[in-house]
């Protein structure tokens, strides 16, 4: 139980800006439990975002424009910009059109290139559009918590099932200890949390299933893409995946609300 709690705290330290003052020892047990706790951290992030949105929308007259912008930036801030940085590094490397080895070197470079700036602007512009249009047409507050939960659960699967691009870095450090069993535990935890959400608010179950299918599709596409373009999975690749899949899930919700109305 101590290892499980330490693993959860390690995930919170790594994936969020929530201050955890405790020094967590890095070992095989905490690393494995940290991967298993990815869905729990995703759910925690989702609850924070949902509660913030509820307060802003229920106790103020803030416009949908402000609500959409606040929700989008909160998701980036609470992760400490970690995933956004990964998206930018991957974009710089991909649009360099170099060989795999050179792309890996570019991802490790701390400098920000023009393509990184353009790609993050494009990503956030489209996400803002999807969030804003969804809020205008009616956003179910429970779905706000589903998106981070799905993205972090999927990140655990991509981390374990994707081929590591190199033997150093964050992804390699986790892969040294975690295996497919840990990915399966993360999936079970994620599914249980989704089931709890659907039990609390049953009317969203169709949308949740649709989003889960979209997430599974995104994992397979991302795995093929990163292995072909970068030789495998890195920490930056995982960060880019989280940013990309969250934008993709917001797009799916917008499409459902605009054309299917489930």
UniProtKB/Swiss-Prot annotation:
Catalyzes what? alpha-ribazole + adenosylcob(III)inamide-GDP = adenosylcob(III)alamin + GMP + H(+); alpha-ribazole 5'-phosphate + adenosylcob(III)inamide-GDP = adenosylcob(III)alamin 5'-phosphate + GMP + H(+)
Q: Which cysteines are joined by disulfide bonds?
A: none
Instruction: Please name the InterPro entries in this protein's record.
Output: CobS
The subcellular location is: Cell membrane
Key word Kinase present in the record? no
Q: Which keywords label this protein?
A: Cell membrane, Cobalamin biosynthesis, Magnesium, Membrane, Transferase, Transmembrane, Transmembrane helix
| Cofactor(s) needed | Mg(2+)
EC number(s) of the enzyme? 2.7.8.26
Q: Where, by residue number, does the polypeptide cross the bilayer?
A: 4-21, 37-57, 62-82, 112-132, 141-161, 181-201, 202-222, 236-256
Q: Does the keyword Transmembrane helix apply?
A: yes
Q: Name one GO molecular function term.
A: cobalamin 5'-phosphate synthase activity
Q: Which Pfam families match?
A: CobS
**Known function:** Joins adenosylcobinamide-GDP and alpha-ribazole to generate adenosylcobalamin (Ado-cobalamin). Also synthesizes adenosylcobalamin 5'-phosphate from adenosylcobinamide-GDP and alpha-ribazole 5'-phosphate.
Q: Per the similarity annotation, which family is this?
A: Belongs to the CobS family.
What name does this protein carry? Adenosylcobinamide-GDP ribazoletransferase
**Origin organism of this chain?**
Geobacillus sp. (strain WCH70)
């Amino acid at each position: 139980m101590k290892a499980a709690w330490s693993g959860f705290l390690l995930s919170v330290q790594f994936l969020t800006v929530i201050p955890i003052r405790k020094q967590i020892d890095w070992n095989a047990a905490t690393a494995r439990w940290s991967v298993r706790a990815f869905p729990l951290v995703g759910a925690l992030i989702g609850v924070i975002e949902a509660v913030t949105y509820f307060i802003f929308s229920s106790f103020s007259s803030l416009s949908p424009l402000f609500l959409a912008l606040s929700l989008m930036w909160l998701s980036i801030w609470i992760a400490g910009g970690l995933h956004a940085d990964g998206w930018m590094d991957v974009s710089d490397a991909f649009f360099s059109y170099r060989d795999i080895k050179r792309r890996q070197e570019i991802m490790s470079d701390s400098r920000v290139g023009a393509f990184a700036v353009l790609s993050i602007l494009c990503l956030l512009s489209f996400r803002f559009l999807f969030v804003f249009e969804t809020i205008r047409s009616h956003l179910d507050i429970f779905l706000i918590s589903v998106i981070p939960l799905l993205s972090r659960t999927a990140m655990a699967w991509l981390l374990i099932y994707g081929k590591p691009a190199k033997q150093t870095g964050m992804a390699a450090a986790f892969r040294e200890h975690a295996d497919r069993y840990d990915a399966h535990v993360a999936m079970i935890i994620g599914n249980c949390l989704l089931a709890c959400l659907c039990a609390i608010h049953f009317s969203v179950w169709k949308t949740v299933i649709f989003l889960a299918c979209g997430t599974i599709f995104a994992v397979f596409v991302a795995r093929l893409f990163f292995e072909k373009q970068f030789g495998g999975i890195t920490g930056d690749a995982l960060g880019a995946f989280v940013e990309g899949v969250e934008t993709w899930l917001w797009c799916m919700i917008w499409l459902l609300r605009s054309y299917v109305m489930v």
